[in-house]
Every structure is written in structure tokens, then in C-alpha cells.
């Protein structure tokens, strides 16, 4: 068993050197059904992004949906890894991967146990900002890694809570994690870069303490399912 096709246009940087090993079979949100059919796969693995196409894809091959549960993020990622181990007859490697990741998580938790600063995660997208906290797609930062969320109630929707400059200052995180969605999808955005160059941002504790941290956007946005 081997992977023969994927959405190569949206490969995260750490997998980019492998892109030419696979046929391009569409995007993260829309499959190229003809290209998939030509590959004659024995199995098609999709995420929630492609659920609307599941019935159509099942005409080509059986479909397995690997998704994540934001209320039990790490638990669902472990389940996905185990499932992939079974599919590709690599159960032992899957178990080893889970053990390694658990060790990394425990290492981070040992450090965050001594951090009391309040944390917010901010997603930048074509010049707009969305805030995320516990119970969200980035809730792993708080619920598994142990960072302390801000006191403000943040809507835990898939796309986060829209926030402006005044709102960000009112929340006033002491640590701000930033994920650039536009960059994750392969496009540089001057609008996004300019979002954090603002007097309101400069007044936040996160800025004053030099704790605005840019996360690897493609890793956090594209690879969230493990």
C-alpha cells in the first residue's frame, strides 16, 4: 500500500520536497475527480473539508474520513494515527509515533506549568483577524499543551471570533500566538503583515513583553489533523 495522489499545491513546507512523488488530485477543498479516477485508487482518505464530495468519491473507491474533535483534539489525532497505521500495515510505527508525540507534549506541559501569562491565538486572513481560545481548532494549545487562556469569552467556532484592534487591546493577551492563514495557502499578504503594526497592538502586554509569536502557519493550519 502506498500514497499515489494528494493535493500537492497545498503541501506544507516540511513535505514540499515530496510533492513530485505524487499525482496532484485537486485542492484541500475540491478534488479533481477525473485525476482521482485515473489513478484507480483502492482507498481515498479525506478530511472534513471534502465531506460534500464523499458520495461522489465513493463511486471511485471506498472513502475514509479522518477528522479531529476539537473537544478531544489529541485523542482524535491519536485515533487518526492508529487508523493510518492499520491502513498501511504500519501499526508499530504508528504506536511509536504516538509515544514520541506524547513525550513532546509532556515536555511542553512541564514548561507551561510555570507560565501564568494569559494567551490568545490569532488567525490572520487577507487583512482580517480572528481570535481562538479553548474549545476551538487551536484549543490544543490550551487543553493539551497547558497554556493559560485569556479571561475573555472567545467564541469557539471553526472560524474563530472576528476581532478588531480595539477588541484585541481589550482582551490584552500577555502572550499572542499568530497564524497567517493566507501564507499557509501559499500567498504572501502585505495586509496581514500590516495588521500587527498598529498602535493598538503596540499597547498590548504581549507586544510590550516581546511575546508576539509567529507560529509555522502551514504546519498549524494545514496539518491540524495529525
Feature map (PLM): residue ranges:
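A short, structured surface patch at a secondary-structure boundary
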Residues: 1-38, 49
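Proline-aspartate-enriched helix->loop->beta-strand connector
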Residues: 38-46, 62, 168, 172-177
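Short helix-initiation/N-cap motifs at beta->coil->alpha
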Residues: 25-32, 155-164
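Solvent-exposed loop/turn segments at secondary-structure junctions
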Residues: 9-11, 30, 43, 50-52, ...
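Alpha-helical, coiled-coil/dimerization segments enriched in small aliphatic residues
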Residues: 10-13, 131-161
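Ligand-binding pocket segment of bilobal, Venus flytrap-like solute-binding proteins
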Residues: 140, 158-185
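Structured C-terminal subdomain patch of bacterial secreted/periplasmic proteins
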Residues: 76, 174-226
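Extracytoplasmic substrate-binding proteins
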Residues: 53-56, 60-126, 211, 220-226
Amino acid at each position: 500500500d502506498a500514497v499515489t495522489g494528494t493535493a500537492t499545491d497545498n503541501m506544507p513546507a516540511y513535505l514540499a520536497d515530496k510533492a513530485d512523488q505524487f499525482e496532484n488530485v485537486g485542492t484541500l477543498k475540491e478534488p479533481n475527480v477525473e485525476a482521482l479516477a485515473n489513478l484507480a485508487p483502492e482507498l481515498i482518505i479525506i478530511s472534513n473539508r471534502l465531506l460534500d464530495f464523499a458520495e461522489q468519491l465513493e463511486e471511485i473507491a471506498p472513502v475514509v474520513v479522518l477528522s479531529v474533535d476539537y473537544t478531544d483534539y489529541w485523542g482524535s489525532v491519536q485515533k487518526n494515527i492508529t487508523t493510518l497505521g492499520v491502513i498501511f500495515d504500519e501499526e508499530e510505527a504508528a504506536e511509536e509515533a504516538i509515544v514520541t508525540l506524547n513525550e513532546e507534549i509532556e515536555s511542553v506541559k512541564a514548561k507551561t506549568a510555570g507560565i501564568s501569562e494569559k494567551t490568545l491565538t490569532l488567525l490572520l486572513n487577507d487583512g482580517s483577524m480572528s481570535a481562538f481560545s479553548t474549545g476551538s481548532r487551536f484549543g490544543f494549545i490550551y487543553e493539551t499543551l497547558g497554556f493559560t487562556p485569556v479571561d475573555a469569552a472567545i467564541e469557539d467556532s471553526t472560524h474563530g471570533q472576528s476581532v478588531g484592534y480595539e477588541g484585541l487591546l481589550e482582551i490584552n493577551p500577555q502572550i499572542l500566538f499568530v497564524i497567517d492563514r493566507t501564507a499557509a495557502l501559499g500567498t504572501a499578504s502585505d495586509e496581514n503583515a500590516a495588521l500587527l503594526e498598529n498602535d493598538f497592538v503596540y499597547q498590548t502586554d504581549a507586544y510590550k513583553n516581546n511575546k508576539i509569536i509567529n507560529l509555522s502557519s502551514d504546519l498549524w493550519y494545514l496539518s491540524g489533523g495529525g
